Amino acid sequence: MKKIALKNAARGTAFDYAGQSWILLENDDGRALCLSKVIIETRAFDEGNCNNFAVASSKEYLNGAYLDNLLEDVNGPNAFLTTELDLTTDDGLKDYGTCTVTIFLLTVDQYRRNRDVIPNADDWWWLSTAFSTKSNGYESLARRVDTDGTLDWNGAFSGFDGLRPACYLDSDLLISIEDDEATDDVTPEHAGEIIAALAEQFGGTFATEDQLTTALSFMLGTLRATREKEARHE
């Protein structure tokens, strides 16, 4: 096993935290958007058949009993971050505004943006985005994801769809991954450092392709060694 900071992990990396298996979707300004690897249970979006996630029973459950169970499995200060979730509906209405949450269901936009690294599930699962709003004649339809990854909708009271929690974690969180899953992908920050170093050494030009390959291999080896040294001291 190898420990790396979440901010240095590749999109799609699977890891365990707080007794739950997560998938890293994206890193943004110190915050890592993560999705549960599996559906945790089937449950109504809202027991009162309301498609506004801000007042939905699923939101209360995820940020109540479910979050409490996660925190019980955290050893020390937790890395969960609160966020303002955009509840713009699928047709662009903003009646539902935003809501402050720690654990949530992905929005349609978050799902679409990260579809390439989200594995299909073995059941339908809810998103937090409503089909439309009560003012437009749709107070109960909410978006969901089907087993093949396509988008669909269902009545909010349905207990046949699953909850697949999402969260933002501090991107400095150290996670454990298998050595063969460790990536040599270079972040934009590290890529800039490598290019600057190569340009300084060779004056911005390379005599041969072999020269470029050798120099880049050396820089990547140095970068890997530095990361491993940092991990040992954290």
Tell me what each language-model feature is.
Residues 202-210:
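Charged, low-complexity interaction regions
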Residues 1-189:
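Collagenous Gly-X-Y triple-helix signature in extracellular proteins
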Residues 186-203:
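N-terminal acidic leader/helix
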Residues 10, 149-150, 195, 214, ...:
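N-terminal secretory targeting and juxtamembrane "stalk" segments of secreted and cell-surface proteins
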Residues 173, 220-230:
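C-terminal alpha-helix/helix-terminus motif
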